[in-house]
Amino acid sequence: MPFLELTLPCTRATQPRFENALEDVGALAVTMLDAHAGTINERAILEPGVGEVRLWEETELTALFDGDSDPLMLLAALEAFDPSLDTRHATFRSVEDSAWERAWIDQFKPMRFGARTFIVPWNQDLPEEANTPDAAVVRLDPGLAFGSGTHQTTALCLRWLDALAGEGQLQGCSVLDFGCGSGILALAALKLGAANAVGVDYDPQALLATAENAERNAMEAQMQVYLPQDEPVQTYPVVLANILATALDALAETLAARVAPGGRIALSGIMQGQEQDLVQRYTPWFEHLHCEYDAEWVRIDGVRRH
């Protein structure tokens, strides 16, 4: 079934009102893009602060509605919800569901990380190499695009977990995945032998994605999810944080306090050029800090001082 796509230009100041109005009138999804994307005025927003949402000064909002929605009635409903909204520059077009949904699903293929860790879309067959008793297979819903293993930051963490399991460091332990997204790292740790895992994220939708993927992998009893303010304060033998450098810097004391003495930590989401400042930041709490590189991305791992 096709969808009706509505595109609206707005500013940083008016974006929240537009987004609320779109959701109120039945938008199935709302996305935000730089209004100058693809031009010399395009501006990247790579590093929001912890719990912060940053927007462009001029933003393009795109909303999807059921294909049988009436454009004129939608505009009237938006203006009725908030008469101050300027909808004069709204545009509509019909979008086939396969044009966006299938494109993402089709590019998500089974992937291997390290010796025995596999990430496989739930709707695809296991590759032959994953049909072994010791394979650690995580099934993910490719529609939950909070982390699928395709990005280097996630791949760096998955390879680290696989190596850790090979050393016997994961067996029977508890794992904290801070910034859990889809839950891919926590679930991989469980598949590799961890006894239980906790996923923490600022985004409630990420917690929902993690819980759904845990259920899909029959691991809901071993997986707990929390918003940061609700997380029980405890220590873990293994902690992962695949977020961004600014957040890793701001959360250094918090993350260090979560790692048990002698425990292991992996930090990812770091771009080349940012790693040395973070190594220095974490040195008071960790030793044997090591940087692993994949293209322009870096993972830092280390051992908690006693």
UniProtKB/Swiss-Prot annotation:
Q: Name one GO molecular function term.
A: protein-lysine N-methyltransferase activity
Q: Which UniProt keywords apply?
A: Cytoplasm, Methyltransferase, S-adenosyl-L-methionine, Transferase
- Disulphide-bridged cysteine pairs: none
Q: Which reaction is the catalytic activity of this chain?
A: L-lysyl-[protein] + 3 S-adenosyl-L-methionine = N(6),N(6),N(6)-trimethyl-L-lysyl-[protein] + 3 S-adenosyl-L-homocysteine + 3 H(+)
UniProt entry tagged with the keyword Signal: no
* Matching CDD domains: AdoMet_MTases (cd02440)
Q: Which domain of life is it from?
A: Bacteria
Give binding positions for S-adenosyl-L-methionine. T154, G179, D201, N242
What is the documented function of this protein? Methylates ribosomal protein L11.
Q: What is this protein called?
A: Ribosomal protein L11 methyltransferase
UniProt organism field = Xanthomonas campestris pv. campestris (strain ATCC 33913 / DSM 3586 / NCPPB 528 / LMG 568 / P 25)
